[in-house]
Amino acid sequence: MPEWIVEEGIGEVRAALVEDGEVLEARVRREGVVPAGAVLDAKLVAVAPRVTVEADGAQFLLPRGVSGVTEGARLAIEVTREALGGSEPWKRGLARRTEAAPAPAPPLAEGAKGTIEAWDELLEEARTGIVRFEGGELRIQPTAAMTVIDVDGWLIPAKLAQMAAWAAARAIRRLDIGGSIGIDFPTLHGKEERREVDEILNGYLPHPFEKTAINGFGFAQIVRPKLRPSLLELAENRARFEARALVRRAGRSIGGTTVTAHPAVIAAIDEGWHKRLERQVGGAVTLSADPSLAMSGGHVH
């Protein structure tokens, strides 16, 4: 039976729904980012061009707008999507006005605390955006408009689309992909072929979601709730992503150790993380920058 495992890490909290050692679903909550579900006391700082409030040192957009208040007014908000990271205005956190009292966000998941053994495999999928399955592979790319899933393989189109539908539904859960998702299947000429692929998606995707039927060109669009960045979006900030992964590996050491990585990754390990890592391993941790290493090539010894 699948069980949630919650891993309290340095820089992030990780949660995974695991069955027989396989991660079925994963979530990440970054340290220092206000999570979805939190209710905050906020200040309205702008009504144009976007309704913007400020709370807990961060700015949030209110897509539904707000009426009856002017700039400088105080109001309660509920965070509906965490900030995605990045300087673009649309990547700020999203919120809505509420009458509820300030309260923390609910837990990332309800489960036992422990170590997620298959986490490194999941990170590799997030790094590359490539998910392999029998007969082909998915290439997944986040864009400003949607996350695009392209299907490639060597099976006949109908069989490839069926296998890809299962793999895409699995990847959407594993990589925590929400919001608008486009899947570009092979062209399917028959209605029955398209119906079979639709049924696979409907059967494997967890609710709630909305989905268009697959059109004659093999394209389907899915819309799921989006509470936080997907693992793919987190991987776009590569230095920070690799820094968190490396600190996680280093945390398994006992006593003094040396962490060697690309200079950008070393620079992304802030002082607070470094000190906590030393306390966790029970010894001095030396950070060593090596420009010859790839961003994902860091090691601990």
What are the residue ranges of the model-derived segments?
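DE-rich acidic low-complexity regions and acidic surface loops
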Residues: 1-301
